[in-house]
């Protein structure tokens, strides 16, 4: 049974982009970041990925002597795209799994890293984006990186934070599955070339 709130984005005969949610159709040209090839499509993140919001533990529920599974508390755990494990908990409640893309959403926002170690509890400063359809996770991280500036600009409150809806509503350009890895590979090559150029100039 199809979700009545399912979002379907399509290009009309007038070359404008529209989104259909239930029986409502509206023009979303202002939300479309760029044109895409004919065999690509735009889709909201919530249609293909699961978003898991973390929950804080009390001091009595975690430790630093590796008792239990890792406890990821926030941006302090993120180092150059990797996760440092410094706390553990024997009573996890909200669990990230290996392969999830982890994103900081409170305080220092927009830090990202893949879960490469397995089950861990995440605090409320962290969201886990879970790939439920076997798409290319690295491609997803590149898409979110494209929006990082916009995501940070949307952060609200005395302690900056982004909401679930900020992430779930992101409009992503999705190429055919076999093309996603090619896009990732080409961007990696371009980034490496830029790195070499910057190093040669410094």
Give the location of each predicted region.
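Extended, domain-scale alpha-helical bundle/helix-rich regions
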Residues: 1-24
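Non-catalytic DNA-recognition/assembly elements of restriction-modification systems
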Residues: 19-20, 24-56, 169, 173-185, ...
């Amino acid at each position: 049974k199809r979700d009545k709130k399912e979002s379907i984005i399509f290009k009309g005969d007038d070359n404008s982009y529209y989104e259909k949610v239930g029986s409502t159709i509206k023009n979303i040209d202002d939300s479309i970041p760029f044109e895409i090839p004919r065999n690509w499509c735009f889709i909201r993140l919530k249609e293909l990925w699961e978003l898991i919001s973390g929950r804080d533990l009390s001091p009595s529920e975690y430790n630093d002597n590796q008792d239990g599974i890792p406890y990821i508390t926030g941006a302090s755990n993120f180092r150059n795209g990797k996760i440092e494990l410094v706390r553990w908990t024997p009573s996890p409640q909200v669990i990230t799994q290996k392969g999830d893309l982890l994103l900081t959403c409170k305080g220092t926002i927009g830090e990202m890293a893949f879960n490469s170690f397995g089950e861990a509890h995440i605090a409320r400063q962290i969201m886990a984006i879970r790939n439920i359809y076997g798409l290319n996770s690295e491609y997803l991280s590149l898409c979110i990186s494209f929006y990082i500036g916009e995501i940070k600009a949307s952060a609200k409150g005395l302690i900056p934070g982004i909401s679930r809806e900020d992430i779930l509503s992101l409009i992503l350009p999705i190429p055919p599955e076999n093309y996603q890895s090619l896009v990732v590979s080409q961007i990696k090559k371009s980034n490496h070339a830029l790195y070499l150029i910057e190093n040669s100039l410094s």
